[in-house]
């Protein structure tokens, strides 16, 4: 608890065309760079570096690189605030880089390279494209991931975070990229069907059934959730 500081707050206004205006108050998050990874007896196996105070994100990159801890890098909404060297430092040693098509174009421009060259900097990159699905680039291989079909589009806020959560679940389980990407796609689908970023729920059985409806049967899911 940071005495005297309020909790970080984000307010996102979305119109009927899914255009968004975001107002953000960092509050206590501005002190996040003072935190350190727990390395004494609780060393993490994998770290997700997602939008945070930019100084904290840079500090996490250094800690992961110094301690040989693999990490996923997702600058997301902080990409506009970061410069090219900062973004490149985060990308260089990342196990995976994830972002939407707009963010990838911005990162490439700031770093001073093409998007194709950016895919070569990191061995595994994931570009999300909203309703058009996603593209995964892994060591020269390209996987096109279709978008899962939502029952209703209530609010797109939080879809990227949900996609990342599904992707990390499949990635850390060692599943093939086509399956991992589809898990991520379906996870994002649940998020956009609800107002609020964490209001969705599903059971393992429901998830597997809906995966089959969208993409066909996948025996690896039974092993993952078994």
Regions found by a protein language model. Give the residues of each.
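Short, acidic/turn-prone active-site loops that include or flank metal/cofactor-
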Residues: 3-4, 26-29, 75-79, 102-103, ...
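Short loop segments at secondary-structure junctions
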Residues: 16-19, 27-29, 102, 110, ...
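Conserved phosphate-binding/catalytic region of the ribokinase-like
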Residues: 111-226
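Conserved beta-alpha-beta core of the PfkB/ribokinase-like small-molecule kinase fold
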Residues: 46-116, 124, 132-134
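Conserved N-terminal subdomain of the carbohydrate kinase-like
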Residues: 1-46, 208-226
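Short, hinge-like loop/turn segments at secondary-structure boundaries
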Residues: 14-19, 66, 89-92, 114-117, ...
């Amino acid at each position: 608890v940071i005495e005297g500081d309020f909790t970080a707050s984000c307010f996102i206004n979305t119109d009927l065309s899914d255009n968004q205006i975001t107002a953000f108050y960092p509050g206590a998050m501005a002190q996040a760079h003072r935190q350190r990874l727990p390395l004494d007896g609780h060393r993490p196996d994998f770290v997700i570096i997602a939008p945070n105070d930019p100084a904290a994100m840079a500090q996490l990159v250094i800690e992961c690189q110094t301690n040989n801890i693999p990490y996923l890098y997702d600058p997301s909404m902080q990409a506009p605030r970061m410069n090219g060297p900062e973004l490149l430092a985060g990308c260089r040693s990342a196990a995976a880089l994830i972002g939407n098509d707009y963010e990838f174009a911005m990162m490439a421009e700031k770093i001073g390279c093409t998007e194709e060259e950016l895919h070569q900097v990191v061995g595994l990159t994931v570009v999300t494209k909203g309703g058009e699905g996603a593209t995964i680039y892994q060591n020269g291989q390209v996987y096109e991931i279709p978008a899962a079909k939502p029952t209703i589009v209530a609010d797109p806020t939080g879809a990227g975070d949900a996609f990342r959560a599904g992707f990390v679940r499949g990635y850390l389980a060692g599943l093939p990229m086509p399956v991992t990407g589809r898990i991520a796609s379906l996870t994002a689908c649940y998020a956009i069907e609800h107002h609020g970023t964490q209001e969705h729920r599903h059971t393992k059985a429901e998830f597997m059934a809906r995966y089959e409806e969208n993409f066909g049967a996948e025996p690896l899911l039974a092993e993952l959730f078994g």
